[in-house]
A protein has these predicted regions:
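Thiamine diphosphate
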Residues: 1-58, 67-88
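Short, surface-exposed connector motifs at secondary-structure boundaries
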Residues: 2-5, 64-65, 207-212
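Low-complexity, flexible helical/coil segments
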Residues: 17-19, 40-45, 64-72, 103-108, ...
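Flexible, low-complexity linker and terminal segments
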Residues: 80, 85-221
Length: 221
């Protein structure tokens, strides 16, 4: 019933890959924070680098999608992490947050916001069975393709999830090829739909249309 958070950099993120894949399969909220440094291997552990973007997207086995968010400045880390938490708990997904050594060692004046000024993060825990539901269907989805979140130990909502592929809706273990293909596409579609709830980005400068678009991210934005 709570959000998991883990932080590392370099090879430490590689070691967490198996658990990240499990979180994708379980469809549970998890925040993975990667403070990027020079690599590969031990590499340049005290120097900054933005070299883990492809790892954040694809560094897990199988079809294993998750949202990736990056901060641009030390102050932006607060807003970016806050947004990552919102996405994780409202869309039942692990989220990768990318910072780097330059940001981590940076400093700037920043006013800590009042809690009442922050956008609300609403979490809808499942409290009981729906009408006509005999037992919890752990992979029954809403319009956002998000499965229900029942706090472990809630009477009447006992269920089982794990790393083996699950049958759609019921959550029973399934080796059926058609079901696996359906679940792979559904997990990807759920992550893709998150974009429907994020405002369109604005151009910093230049014309609204053109042949070339320059996109910056992270500390080199």
């Amino acid at each position: 019933g709570a959000l998991g958070v883990t932080t590392s950099s370099g090879p430490g993120i590689a070691l967490k890959g198996e658990a990240m894949g499990l979180a994708v399969m379980l469809e549970i909220p998890l925040l993975i924070i990667n403070i990027q440094r020079g690599g590969p291997s031990t590499g340049l552990p005290t120097k900054t680098e933005q070299s883990d973007l492809m790892q954040a997207y694809y560094g897990r086995n199988g079809e294993c999608p998750m949202p990736v968010i990056s901060a641009s400045t030390p102050a932006d880390c607060f807003d970016a992490v806050y947004e990552a938490v919102r996405i994780a708990v409202q869309h039942m997904t692990p989220v990768m947050f990318l910072s780097d050594g330059y940001i981590a060692n940076g400093a700037e004046p920043w006013r800590f916001p009042k809690s009442e000024d922050l956008p609300a993060i609403t979490v809808n825990f499942k409290k009981g069975l729906d009408e006509g539901e005999e037992k919890l269907q752990p992979y029954k989805r809403d319009e956002k393709l998000v499965r229900p979140w029942a706090i472990p130990g809630t009477p009447g909502l006992e269920h089982r999830i794990g790393g083996l592929e699950k049958q759609d809706v019921t959550g029973n273990i399934s080796y059926d090829a058609d079901n696996h293909q359906h679940m792979v596409k559904t997990r990807q579609a759920k992550v893709d739909k998150i974009a429907d709830y994020i405002p369109l980005q604005k151009l910093d400068s230049g014309a609204a249309t053109g042949k070339v678009l320059v996109v910056g991210w992270g500390s080199t934005y």
